[in-house]
Amino acid sequence: MSFKLKILTPTTGFNRTGYTTSLVRLVMYFAQNRIYPECGEQTIDYRTIEGSGISSNRELLIQEFLESDATHVLFIDEDMGFDPRTLHIVAGRRQPIVGCNYPMRVPGAGFTALAKDRKARIITNEQSYGIEPAFYTGFGFCLIERQVFEKIQRPWFLIGFNTSTRYYTTEDAAFAHMVNEAGIPWYVDHDASKGICHIGNFNYWWNETIQKPIITSESTEWEKA
């Protein structure tokens, strides 16, 4: 079998150092370790589009993805830091969509992942492990099989308006409704989520301990600020 990956990052042009360092280390780990034991071929490619229209740029990136022979797409946002093994963890679940859970970039605002019934946010804590069905996780670090985009029609990433909250929705919400209607499961990976941070004024981790990255020539280590 083959695992042909495209990493896609729609960017505003402000890629964080933590994102860049994490991406380099992920690619190095990918080059040295098989995704699956039976994988005879694995390749990796990277594409980005810079601009303020994140929703439309996601759409363009997926169009290009579908014109290739890639089997999987990995969305990574420009403000994410991650362990180099994170891709292997989510890919190892062998599910159509597996994403990571991470705190929003506001202290106390909670996690991005929304429960399947859409009544509460999913919490990742010390007791959380494995994967859990979700309505969506967000696209901060999210692996999606090619077949998902072949089963649902464009537009994939519409911006909507919630008449109850009086707020505009993000593009992942529209995508989540489409995959849910198509019967495609979306999972949050709690194990992978514990290697993810959301980079803002501070690095927001799953346990919401404010931490800062210490980058060395050999590895990335984390210490409390």
Please report, for each region that a protein language model flagged, where it lies by residue.
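Conserved catalytic core of nucleotide-sugar-dependent glycosyltransferases
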Residues: 62, 83-161
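N-proximal low-complexity "stem/linker" segments adjacent to membrane-targeting elements
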Residues: 1-51, 56
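Active-site nucleotide-sugar/metal-binding loop of Leloir-type enzymes
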Residues: 59-72
